[in-house]
């Protein structure tokens, strides 16, 4: 993304910072940060629609056969529509802000199409413990239907996030890129999983669009920060036929719609004040 506009205004003893981000598909993401003298920050975000046509990607017949699943053709057609994996914001806190308390679904990780077995409640954990060590690192540790989140050190001031409506979140000791980025580690492509035609061509630029580089659980080590992802919505996991199916339509996020959501950041002296901070409507 890139910032296309940023303006600041002062009103009622508060300062509003309005930032417009242009996303790769042509959507605008407009975020307004209203900052009060007591440190409270109200965040309101709007995602605008786009009708930009997706780019068609050619896939070899060998790859189609190697990745065949029941309904795979329908899944490919569905995947050709512009969708958004998640809509939200992310920020980082010092590693000392490792203690996490939240009012949402838990204690296990859960997603919008994988959450009926988790109960809504108030849970206490740490960013370290929220990590789920999949053998192949990937998205993990998400929690849905969340009302508020408190992050704090063992002693001292903390931060409470109060949602305007139900949100999802991750709070982990790694970045998104650590788990699911081609550039996370300089591992080679696993060419034995490619078709003979693709192996013969040995085109690394083409390979990244077929089978991504793989890294493993032993490649993940905690960073010196806590990365917090706050999502209006993250699309479902899918995979109802074992591994290949797309999420159901109501668990997807079409890019041709507008979305608006928000939350408020409230500084507190300790995580024990989370319940009190969450009582108020900051909008």
Residue ranges and their predicted role:
Residues 1-283:
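Beta-strand/loop-rich accessory regions of lumenal/periplasmic or secreted enzymes
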């Amino acid at each position: 993304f890139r910032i296309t506009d940023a303006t600041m205004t002062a009103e009622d003893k508060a300062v509003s910072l309005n930032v417009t981000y242009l996303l790769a598909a042509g959507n605008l993401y407009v975020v307004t940060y209203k900052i009060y003298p007591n440190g409270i920050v109200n965040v309101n975000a709007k995602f605008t629609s786009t009708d930009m046509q997706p780019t068609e990607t050619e896939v070899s017949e060998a790859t189609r056969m190697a990745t065949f699943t029941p309904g795979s053709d329908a899944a490919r057609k569905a995947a050709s529509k512009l969708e958004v994996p998640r809509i939200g914001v992310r920020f980082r806190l010092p590693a000392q802000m490792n203690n996490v308390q939240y009012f949402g679904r838990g204690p296990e990780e859960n997603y919008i199409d994988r959450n009926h077995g988790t109960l809504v409640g108030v849970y206490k954990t740490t960013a370290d413990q929220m990590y789920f060590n999949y053998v192949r690192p990937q998205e993990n540790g998400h929690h849905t239907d969340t009302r508020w989140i408190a992050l704090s050190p063992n002693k001292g001031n903390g931060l409470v996030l109060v949602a305007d409506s139900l949100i999802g979140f991750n709070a982990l000791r790694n970045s998104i890129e650590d788990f699911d980025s081609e550039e996370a580690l300089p591992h080679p492509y696993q060419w034995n999983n490619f078709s003979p035609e693709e192996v013969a061509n040995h085109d690394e630029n083409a390979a990244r669009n077929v089978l991504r580089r793989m890294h493993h659980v032993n490649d993940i080590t905690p960073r010196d920060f806590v990365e917090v992802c706050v999502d209006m919505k993250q699309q479902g996991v899918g995979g109802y036929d074992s591994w290949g199916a797309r999420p159901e339509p109501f668990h997807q996020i079409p890019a041709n719609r507008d979305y608006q959501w928000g939350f408020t950041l409230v500084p507190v002296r300790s995580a024990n004040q989370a319940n009190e901070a969450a009582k108020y409507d900051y909008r």
